[in-house]
Amino acid sequence: MLPLPLIANGKGFIRALENDGALAVYAPLEGGYEGRYQRRLRANGYASISLSARGLGDVEAYLMQVHGVRPAHLGKKNIAQEGAVGPIYFAQPIAGYQLENLPAQSKGLVLWILEGYILSQTEIQDLISLTKRVPKLKVVLEMGGDRVFRWQPLLDCLQAA
């Protein structure tokens, strides 16, 4: 009996991610495939973070720099002191903090970004250039659904659009 493609060891996916740094993936809409490939990445020495593309804003600042965020305005304001925009809170960078604290034997950090189809061409280009500048950072961007789990270099996806 031949092994099913679902039980493959994921070597081609990992090799493509290591070569290109950023991949666009298309997964069946019923789900389950993402978790399998994330588990294979972790088994091969990568740390993994899943996040949504919604609300990323400035990709470089959100992922690699300390950045200011404003909480939702709930109708309360201090008329005498501040405007209605509210205070600024500073958040740690999502990827930068994780990269600094990777174990010594780790191969790198993989950002698995959901709903990547909402990102603009410029934001996708920023992700690609970020993986070129930071070699330990890899990006997997979910770009939509398909009947089978497939991937392509994110740069090819950018050129096709």
Swiss-Prot record:
Q: List the catalytic activities from the record.
A: a plastoquinone + NADH + (n+1) H(+)(in) = a plastoquinol + NAD(+) + n H(+)(out); a plastoquinone + NADPH + (n+1) H(+)(in) = a plastoquinol + NADP(+) + n H(+)(out)
GO cellular component, alphabetical, reads: plasma membrane-derived thylakoid membrane
UniProt-annotated location(s): Cellular thylakoid membrane
Which GO terms fall under molecular function for this chain's record? oxidoreductase activity, acting on NAD(P)H, quinone or similar compound as acceptor; quinone binding
Primary localization? membrane
* Function comment: NDH-1 shuttles electrons from an unknown electron donor, via FMN and iron-sulfur (Fe-S) centers, to quinones in the respiratory and/or the photosynthetic chain. The immediate electron acceptor for the enzyme in this species is believed to be plastoquinone. Couples the redox reaction to proton translocation, and thus conserves the redox energy in a proton gradient. Cyanobacterial NDH-1 also plays a role in inorganic carbon-concentration.
Q: Its quaternary structure?
A: NDH-1 can be composed of about 15 different subunits; different subcomplexes with different compositions have been identified which probably have different functions.
- What is stated as this protein's family in its record? Belongs to the complex I NdhN subunit family.
The name under which this protein is listed is NAD(P)H-quinone oxidoreductase subunit N
- Give the gene that encodes this protein: ndhN
